[in-house]
């Protein structure tokens, strides 16, 4: 067995991926393995985000820390898949190098050339924004609007949201699975109709979200 920081990946999986026989869409065992890799990657990224939150709680600028650290979150998120040979390490360097589309959405994210211009400006605005609630709502929204990566944008966007939550004294906030449709609907309104209010209300209504749960 091979090991990636405590995560065990079988030689059989490595060979299956190498030979092109790994098919999680058709094979339940392969699908379970993919879920395991995703879970391990999420855990690794979560540890990295917690380290970023410590910097924020120590007085660091949340926008600057997000700019400095989000690439590391992304690498951790897909690290187990790199170890398994499912993803190439080079694919995790920088932002996406192609067009990406969002299933069941009318919103088409900006092209890859625009991403290179948008992301530095995005983080600059996060660094300058004085209101934590604005950083939470618009930070999450604009990140997923741009969709800078080929995959994992929602997870990284929620990590970013929680870093901004910490900067305002709010607790860690999750999006329950049963609220997923509400989340997507609110983001669609913001992305297509330019109406951010449903998304702001959605976040405020989440477990841990909203001023009513702010730590003092």
Question: Model-derived features: where do they sit?
Answer:
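FIC/Doc superfamily catalytic core
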Residues: 1-216
């Amino acid at each position: 067995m091979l090991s990636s920081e405590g995560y065990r990946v079988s030689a059989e999986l490595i060979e299956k991926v190498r030979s092109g026989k790994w098919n999680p869409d058709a094979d339940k065992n392969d699908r379970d393995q993919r879920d395991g890799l995703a879970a391990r990657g999420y855990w690794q990224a979560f540890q990295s985000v917690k380290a970023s939150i410590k910097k924020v709680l120590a007085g660091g600028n949340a926008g600057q820390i997000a700019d400095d650290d989000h690439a590391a979150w992304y690498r951790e998120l897909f690290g187990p898949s790199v170890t398994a040979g499912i993803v190439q390490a080079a694919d995790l360097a920088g932002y996406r190098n192609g067009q990406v589309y969002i299933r069941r959405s009318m919103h088409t994210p900006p092209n890859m050339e625009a991403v290179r211009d948008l992301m530095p400006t995005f983080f600059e605005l996060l660094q300058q924004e004085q209101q934590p609630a604005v950083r939470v709502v618009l930070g999450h929204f604009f990140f997923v609007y741009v969709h800078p990566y080929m995959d994992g944008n929602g997870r990284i966007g929620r990590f970013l949201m929680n870093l901004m939550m910490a900067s305002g004294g709010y607790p860690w906030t999750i999006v329950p699975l049963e609220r997923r449709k509400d989340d997507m609907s609110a983001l669609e309104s913001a992305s297509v109709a330019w109406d951010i209010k449903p998304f702001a209300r959605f976040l405020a209504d989440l477990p841990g979200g909203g001023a009513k749960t702010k730590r003092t």
